[in-house]
Amino acid sequence: MSRQVFCRKYQMEMEGLDFAPFPGAKGQEFFENVSKQAWQEWLQHQTTLINEKRLNVFEPEAKKFLEEQREKFFNNDESVEKAEGWKPE
């Protein structure tokens, strides 16, 4: 049986991640409070942001921007960035 978590994005019990997505306290927080589905959706959204905004993920400004967007995404904040011209299917 898969591990269940109360997903902070969807506000319901869902299948959890298999492991923390990155080391440290923040990674553990996502492991405990984000569903596998929500994490996959974030990875897709992050990839879109990186490509459309031509971010260099090695630059501190880009890392900070993505961290801020990740928090907004999982908190269902309306101000999360969308790629220009992007329309959800």
Swiss-Prot record:
Query: Which GO molecular function entries does the Swiss-Prot or TrEMBL record give?
Result: iron ion binding
**Top-level lineage group:** Bacteria
Family matches, as InterPro entries: Fe_traffick_prot_YggX, Fe_traffick_prot_YggX_sf
Keyword terms, alphabetized:
Iron
Which GO BP terms, alphabetically? cellular response to oxidative stress
Does the record bear Membrane in its keywords? Answer: no
Coiled-coil features, chain-numbered ranges: none
Any one cellular-component term (Gene Ontology): cytosol
Give the family, as the similarity comment puts it: Belongs to the Fe(2+)-trafficking protein family.
Which PANTHER family does the UniProt entry name for this protein?
FE(2+)-TRAFFICKING PROTEIN-RELATED
Q: What does this protein do?
A: Could be a mediator in iron transactions between iron acquisition and iron-requiring processes, such as synthesis and/or repair of Fe-S clusters in biosynthetic enzymes.
Protein name per its UniProtKB record: Probable Fe(2+)-trafficking protein
